[in-house]
Amino acid sequence: MKIYLASGNVNKKREVQELLPSHTIVLPKDEGIEFDPEETGSTFFENAMIKAKALYHIVKAPVLADDSGLCVDFLNGAPGIHSARYGSIEGEHVSAEAGINKVLSELKGVKDRSARFACCMVCLLDENRFYSVQETCEGHITEAPSGSGGFGYDPIFFVEKFGKTFAELTSEQKNSISHRGRALFSISRFIKGS
């Protein structure tokens, strides 16, 4: 099945394609579609649904949308839904390095570095059928970035199970425990049953 991914992020596309290998995952920009809806929701679910509905109205085909982010306990859940824009002045996307540096500076000298990645994923098959799931992956924030894999905050997100940051894991290891991997596993069962 051809599934449109409501994103412009090629790294997300790669992860989704790895986890849904029997489907063809397409970004809007792959087909020349301009897509950048305003994420005005106050939760991961609301933002995922905004993206899913906006893209579905354009393509009239199955759409997968996620909204995910890093939630740090000491920062009261920040960056949260603002992870891609954390530290920006006018709400624009910031580089991964800028987001990482902001989180690390805010946690300087802090002992409680517990955090989680959260992902809410929505699969919209048609105007009447959708499925949503929210998953998390627990970990903590390191003192400094480590590893070159992954993307976003992966170099500072340490998971006990492997004793490494997400950026130090193979894609298979990361997908087996990540927030997005867990959500996609649930979504794949929904798609198969539909």
Curated annotation (Swiss-Prot):
Cofactor: Mg(2+)
InterPro entries per the UniProt record, alphabetical: dITP/XTP_pyrophosphatase, ITPase-like_fam, RdgB/HAM1
Catalytic reactions of this protein: XTP + H2O = XMP + diphosphate + H(+); dITP + H2O = dIMP + diphosphate + H(+); ITP + H2O = IMP + diphosphate + H(+)
Cofactor note: Binds 1 Mg(2+) ion per subunit.
Active site: D67 (proton acceptor)
Record's GO cellular component terms: cytosol
Subunit structure: Homodimer.
Family: Belongs to the HAM1 NTPase family.
NCBIfam families: RdgB/HAM1 family non-canonical purine NTP pyrophosphatase
Protein name, UniProt field: dITP/XTP pyrophosphatase
